[in-house]
Design a protein with these regions (language model features):
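Glycine- and acidic-residue-biased ligand/ion/polar-headgroup-sensing regions
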Residues: 1-20, 33, 129, 141-190, ...
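A short secondary-structure junction signal
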Residues: 67, 80-88, 120-123, 131-140, ...
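Conserved metal-binding segment of the jelly-roll/cupin
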Residues: 29-49, 60, 185-206
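A short glycine-rich, His/Asp/Glu-containing loop-to-beta-strand
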Residues: 101-154
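Double-stranded beta-helix
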Residues: 52-109, 205, 212-254
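Catalytic core of Fe(II)/2-oxoglutarate
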Residues: 180-191, 198-226
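Short, structured patches in soluble enzyme cores that scaffold and shape functional sites
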Residues: 48-50, 57-62, 109-111, 123-129, ...
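An anionic, turn-rich surface loop/hairpin at beta-sheet edges
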Residues: 23-29
């Protein structure tokens, strides 16, 4: 599981051993924060230091029983992987400005494929007012590496100022044809489950939109599949014209 300190400070003890304090921000809009990764079987004691401490716990069940998720020669369990609890500071995270124009946003990868973990992938995205993210639209609901990897995802939203909102868009197939499509208003504290489909997000003008994203699947490779009809917007060499589709999955950001 992954514990992200959203605000304030918490004292952490692991198996009776004091790990010190986690937390370096008053809100997630201030910048990247501290996190704690706990592999299956690890237990930690957490205690708030003062008022205003707020944390988020994200977890995925360890592979168990028959089926493709079960540990085996091709998929070791936490003991075989040598996974240990660890503190993740802002300096350990990959922070990048992704996109351009009104789909530019900051992405903070807390737990990426390059970090040792059993199932989880996680990070934070910060949309400036009026800007889009998870754009060009992408999905990850089919296991077809290296073109796409199957990962379920959850978003936890925060809005600054908190009275604002954003919009979570979801669609399958052709957005202008007969397909499953929706647009949902999200406010501060909302959670959105994304089991499948393309899922871009936009912040309302005047409000900064933050979301913690957490993914889990059989594997931990991130191969998002871009909607090729809209991928051209991220290709500066195409002159900003539709029709010059970019399909490389590694171009997608959160």
């Amino acid at each position: 599981e992954l514990i992200v300190v959203e605000a304030g400070r918490i004292a952490v003890a692991l198996d009776g051993r004091d790990l010190g304090s986690l937390g370096n921000r008053r809100t997630p809009f201030e910048g990247p924060g501290d996190a704690l990764y706990l592999p299956p079987g690890a237990e930690a004691s957490l205690r708030a230091e003062g008022e205003g401490a707020r944390l988020v716990r994200a977890a995925a069940p360890p592979p168990d029983g028959p089926g493709p998720d079960r540990p085996g020669p091709d998929r070791p369990g936490p003991e075989q992987m040598g996974l240990v609890p660890r503190v993740i500071r802002p300096a350990d995270q990959r922070i990048a400005e992704v996109g351009r124009e009104n789909w530019r946003r900051q992405v903070r990868t807390i737990l990426g494929p390059e970090h040792e973990a059993l199932r989880l992938l996680a990070g934070e995205t910060l949309n400036p007012p009026g800007n889009w993210s998870s754009y060009p639209p992408h999905k990850h609901d089919v296991d077809a590496p290296p073109l796409e990897s199957r990962l379920e995802e959850v978003y936890l939203f925060r809005v600054d100022p908190p009275g604002g909102f954003g919009v979570q868009v979801r669609y399958h197939g052709d957005v202008d044809g007969e397909s499953d499509r929706s647009a949902t208003v999200v406010v501060d504290g909302d959670v959105a489950a994304i089991p499948s489909g393309y899922h871009p997000v936009v912040a309302a003008p005047g409000y900064t939109l933050y979301y913690l994203w957490v993914m889990a699947g059989v594997g931990r490779a991130m191969h998002p599949h871009l909607d090729s009809r809209h991928a051209w917007v991220d290709d500066p060499g195409d002159g900003g014209r539709p029709g010059g589709a970019v399909t490389s999955s590694d171009r997608a950001g959160r």
